[in-house]
Each structure stands twice: as C-alpha cells, then as structure tokens.
From Swiss-Prot:
Its EC number is 3.1.3.84. It is an enzyme of class 3 (hydrolase). Keywords: Hydrolase, Protein phosphatase. It catalyses: ADP-alpha-D-ribose 1''-phosphate + H2O = ADP-D-ribose + phosphate. Belongs to the POA1 family. Disulfide bonds: none annotated. The keyword Transmembrane does not apply. Residues 1-173 form the Macro domain. The lineage of its organism: Eukaryota, Fungi, Dikarya, Ascomycota, Saccharomycotina. This is ADP-ribose 1''-phosphate phosphatase. PANTHER family: ADP-RIBOSE GLYCOHYDROLASE OARD1, PROTEIN C6ORF130. It comes from the Eukaryota.
Amino acid sequence: MIRYIKGDLLGHLPPSKSSVAVFAHACNCQGVWGGGIAAVLRVKFPSTYPLYSGHCQEKGCDPHRLLGTSVVVPSQASDPGNIAGYPPKYIACLFTSDFAQTQEEIVAYTDSAIEALVDQLKELQKTTAIETGQSGKIVVNMPKINAGIFAVPWEKTEAVLKKYDVEFNVYVI
C-alpha cells in the first residue's frame, strides 16, 4: 500500500514512541551521498554515512555486486535528525543506479532492492520494534525514490512498490 503524505519526510514520527522509523532512499554504488535526499540524510544522520560508505567499499564499489541490493543502517541517538524520546531511525539504502543504467534497468534494480529490504526488515523485526501500520505491516518512509537525480518517472517506481506487502509512506512537498 502506498500512502502519499504532504510534508517533510524527516519530520516523520512513528505512532508509538517505542517503534523505530525506517527512512529509505535510492542511492548510488560509489559510497557517496552527494546530492538529493542522500545529501540531506548525510547531514541529519551523520553516523549512518560511514556505514553506507563502508558497505560500498567492502563490495569494491562494484555496481555488479551492489545494484539491486539494500543495506539498512542504524543511526545514533545523537544524530541531529533524531528526536528525543523516540528510538534512533534506521536508514535503508536502496542500490538502484550507478548513473549508467536505463530507466528500465533502474526499475528492475529497484524491484530487487525493495525485495531485499523487505527481507532485511522482517529479519530485523525479530529483535527491533520496526514501525508498523494499523494493518500490522511494516512501514517504510521515503521520498519519490528514483524520480530526482536518477530521472525515472515516478509511475514506474510506484508500480514496483505496489507489488509488496508493506506500507510505504511517500512524502511529497
């Protein structure tokens, strides 16, 4: 299910103060958050950037090893994007493009990355109170991924998200 929310993604708070919010974004395989929402996440959740970058370095920044995958990294309570009284947020990095892919390839990598993310969150849910909606399904908060720097029409990514049994809160301004 996709729910569109007009507002600031970074202002999202889960309904329960014991739940961990997950913010997802599409990112490159180069280990650099240099533009778009990634650059904002780097400022608001600085503790997550070395984890993302290290993950890319571990894979040799090789698109063939990263595209279509995801990595979920925890932030620290001291990060300026976290709010007192709520658990630190998790940042989900979806490896959807290396800037050399067609729109169709990016969409296919997005499908694989979302599938990997869902699997990772279900596993994480065994030990961490990941935010869930009223339906009991995992909630993932995100902007219109791929629609910015990667220039994929939103409708193509939206069709991928609709396939998954997850609640996606898509923030629009």
